[in-house]
Amino acid sequence: MMAKASISPASNNLTTAIPVVWCVGGVDCSGGAGVTRDAITLADLNIHACVLTTQLTVQSNSIMLSKESMCASALNQQWQVLFEDTPPRAIKIGAIANDEQALLLCARIQKTSNPRPFVVWDPVLSTSSGGVLSELSESVVDELLNTVDIVTPNIDELAWLTHLPVVDEASLLTAINRLRGKGAKSVYVKGGHAHWQKNVSDIFVCASHTLRFSQPKYANGNLRGTGCMLASALAAFIVHDYCIEDALTLANAYVSEVRGHTLPKQCAAANANAISNELTAYFARTNGFPAKPESFPLVTFHQRGATANEKERDKDTLLEASSCKEGHFPALTHTHLG
């Protein structure tokens, strides 16, 4: 049974009561994305975040001026010092600057066991303003795909990872199959950049089944760091002992609820100051466990090799098969949503 997610005032060790997730990635000095956004998201979901820095970026909402990559030995030292007394239940990887960093992470993860942490790779390639963050060779990308448990690209990142154009539903599925063929255990593609979709439709593919998560498009401003937020929330819900399907559903709902909580207020402030919403990338507010039924996606389940078994689950039924143990958050079937 997982320890209660609370901190005793008498405790001298912060991590004795709160599960730990490591965030590997770049520092965004504006705080809108990167490991800063990861740590904020994890804290919001009652997880202690440890940060392993791959690079320092000088950026704002609109521009990246420069970046400085950490050498692989410095990244290795961060791993060593944390692993001694703060081992992770999960690892969320974001921007990796180069092959040396990536190979170090792969080697370290492959040697970690008893227990092995769940590893999420959000393959961040560039900033919202277009600055390049990752320069990885194809062979190293393949090594990462074979090492992590799930990779969470957006449409542009999926095209880069596979060297395939992703311009419609057919090419999307072809690219996902290419990633699976390269060794990816599971793939979650974020559909926010899929211009051909009427709604935003994310897709999860693993060896046994496919899930689609559909949400209405949100046109009321841009929110920075949503990719970081979703991957971190996924890691958090996995650590809180939700099965992968429920964890993805909750992570999707969390981002949707943060977006709905943040953008209307900040768009109103922007309008009051005559700032163009199209040019403003807003900073997310914290939200906690997603609880509004309207924040949850429509989830469509498809068992691979059994097309007649496809079924839809709406916001009031969700996914029944939660493996959540007693802890800080309830199983979906134990809430008014289940």
Regions found by a protein language model. Name each.
Residues 13, 46-50, 210-211, 237-252:
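Phosphate-handling active-site elements
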Residues 18, 69, 245-338:
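Charged C-terminal helix
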